[in-house]
């Protein structure tokens, strides 16, 4: 290695170490201190814990997360198509139109079933029951 390359690597290492030490010292001198009995409680840093860590979430949060991931991955497919649009031509355009049409149908179906509806419907049949089991949403005593 030449002398200039060694100086560049050495100055990078010295600068990185100096930056790390500087940030640690700033945190030590400028940071607050806690001397309470909750100092060693995990993840709380001296603040009294409130509540239980085992909080339950509604299933609707997981449904929204799954729908987000599905549509996000499909967005990646559309990005890949948009990068290679010249190679695919009209056939690729028609395939993407069919793909987007299927996406829109699935989004309309999810809206119809009530995935995005967060109201409680305790006395009504859900639309999923009426679609799969054959129950009518108009007649509540249908069995």
UniProtKB/Swiss-Prot annotation:
Membrane topology: Multi-pass membrane protein
Cysteine pairs bridged by disulfides in the record: none
Keyword terms: Cell inner membrane, Cell membrane, Membrane, NAD, Quinone, Translocase, Transmembrane, Transmembrane helix, Transport, Ubiquinone
Top-rank EC class of the record's enzyme: translocase
Domain of life: Bacteria
Cited InterPro entries: NAD(P)H_OxRDtase_bac/plastid, NADH_UbQ/plastoQ_OxRdtase_su3, NDAH_ubi_oxred_su3_sf
Molecular function (Gene Ontology), one example: NADH:ubiquinone reductase (non-electrogenic) activity
Compartments, as annotated in UniProt: Cell inner membrane
GO cellular component, one term: plasma membrane
Pfam families xrefs: Oxidored_q4
Record-listed E.C. numbers: 7.1.1.-
Catalytic reaction list: a quinone + NADH + 5 H(+)(in) = a quinol + NAD(+) + 4 H(+)(out)
Segments passing through the bilayer: 12-32, 61-81, 90-110
Keyword DNA damage assigned: no
Family stated for the protein in its record: Belongs to the complex I subunit 3 family.
Function as written in the Swiss-Prot or TrEMBL entry: NDH-1 shuttles electrons from NADH, via FMN and iron-sulfur (Fe-S) centers, to quinones in the respiratory chain. The immediate electron acceptor for the enzyme in this species is believed to be ubiquinone. Couples the redox reaction to proton translocation (for every two electrons transferred, four hydrogen ions are translocated across the cytoplasmic membrane), and thus conserves the redox energy in a proton gradient.
Complex formation: NDH-1 is composed of 13 different subunits. Subunits NuoA, H, J, K, L, M, N constitute the membrane sector of the complex.
HAMAP family: NDH1_NuoA
PANTHER family: NADH-QUINONE OXIDOREDUCTASE SUBUNIT A, NADH-UBIQUINONE OXIDOREDUCTASE CHAIN 3
The protein's name: NADH-quinone oxidoreductase subunit A
Source organism (scientific name): Blochmanniella floridana
Taxonomy of the source species: Bacteria, Pseudomonadati, Pseudomonadota, Gammaproteobacteria, Enterobacterales
